[in-house]
Amino acid sequence: MKACGIIVEYNPFHNGHRYHAQQARQQSGAEVVIAIMSGNFLQRGEPALLDKWARAEEALQNGVDLVIELPTAWSVQSADYFAKGGIKLLQALQCESLCFGTDSTSAIDYAAFGQFVQENQSLIDQTFHALTDKQLSYPQKMTAVFRQVYPESRFDFSSPNHILGMSYAKENATYPTPMTLYPIARKQAGFHDATISGKVASATAIRQSVFQQEITQVLPTVPSITAQHLQTQTMISWENYWPFLKYKIVQSSLEELQAIYQMTEGLEYRLKDQIQAAGSFHELMERMKTKRYTWTRLQRLATYILLNMTKEEVETVWQNSYLHVLGFTPKGQAYLKETKAQIQLPVISKVSKENRAMLSLDIRANQLYQMGDSSLKEQNFGRFPLRFSPDT
């Protein structure tokens, strides 16, 4: 069986995501679509609006055959590391192709770009370190670098999906047998579009409408199972965790904060200075952000603090990856069975005594996530892969 991989977050799953899954199958000719999906904490450092089990269910009912969780150590990361984790798991699963969305309005040869980076990494690094403007954010620096070393590309690092597409291409090119890339142009709504019109809207616009209690506006833009979840489940945001985050920052010593992953350049002092005056998560971010430290960078740091993540813990997961199965259709289950002998990573279907140490960071992340609201179900123990048959 041929498999096409997609790397996703589904925050929440909407009609554009269903189109992506359909296009992945159609353009690649694959029998199976495999989604590597972030768990309860996401790439930009946000808690998911709906828990990972609800989002996996939405995916399985709308064109995805197998949902694998992207471990927290990979999911709450900059684009390059997020891509590194996703590609690693898809390669382990023997996927022949990768389909991803792009915000780019012009045709871009992502595979050629990935090959260029693979062959010119030292030049790229040298150009990056030669930049003199220390106030530029990482995306701004990378845009400047590629305008110098690869001018014909006209890359724009301001678009999140475009950045991810380039990161996928770079990482994919490092493997002996790269996957075939299928970029899909976004249908109607862009990543940052905050308005809803028609049946396709961005996840940003959907979340904004949900938090503004404008659920009727959202319903035409999502499949029925997502609509059901949005109407019956508690919606989660950073404000659910603000008391825990504030307590953690206040009670931690500077030395303890310094031990947190990505706590660099004295950010622990700035956090200590600003935390008492901040009355909400949003206010803390506004007080902390600068041209150099973007909202997203600081939001990821807040997640690392909340989860008490350390560099050693993150690197342990990077070196000891695994495939945690969240759900499958009969096709997805058959594919796992067919490829099991070739898969070099542990395949995990439930949290147990045998794998608790390996999954320790994910378990802790899930426990913290569950603390965000009393209505949230158990996320770790007693949970087995969801099964969905499209014919039922």
From Swiss-Prot:
Keyword terms? ATP-binding, Cytoplasm, Ligase, Nucleotide-binding, RNA-binding, tRNA processing, tRNA-binding
List membrane-spanning regions: none
The protein's Enzyme Commission number? 6.3.4.-
Instruction: Name the chain's protein.
Output: tRNA(Met) cytidine acetate ligase
A GO molecular function assigned to this protein is:
tRNA binding
Q: Which cysteines are joined by disulfide bonds?
A: none
User: Where is it chiefly localized?
Assistant: cytoplasm
Judged by the first EC level, this protein's enzyme class is ligase
Where does this protein reside within or beyond the cell? Cytoplasm
**Originating species:** Enterococcus faecalis (strain ATCC 700802 / V583)
Q: Which GO terms describe its biological process?
A: tRNA modification
Q: Note the InterPro entries from the entry.
A: Rossmann-like_a/b/a_fold, tRNA(Met)_cyd_acetate_ligase
Gene3D superfamilies named in the record: HUPs
- What's the superkingdom here? Bacteria
Reaction it catalyzes: cytidine(34) in elongator tRNA(Met) + acetate + ATP = N(4)-acetylcytidine(34) in elongator tRNA(Met) + AMP + diphosphate
Entry function:
Catalyzes the formation of N(4)-acetylcytidine (ac(4)C) at the wobble position of elongator tRNA(Met), using acetate and ATP as substrates. First activates an acetate ion to form acetyladenylate (Ac-AMP) and then transfers the acetyl group to tRNA to form ac(4)C34.
Record-annotated residues binding ATP? 7-20, 101, 161, 186
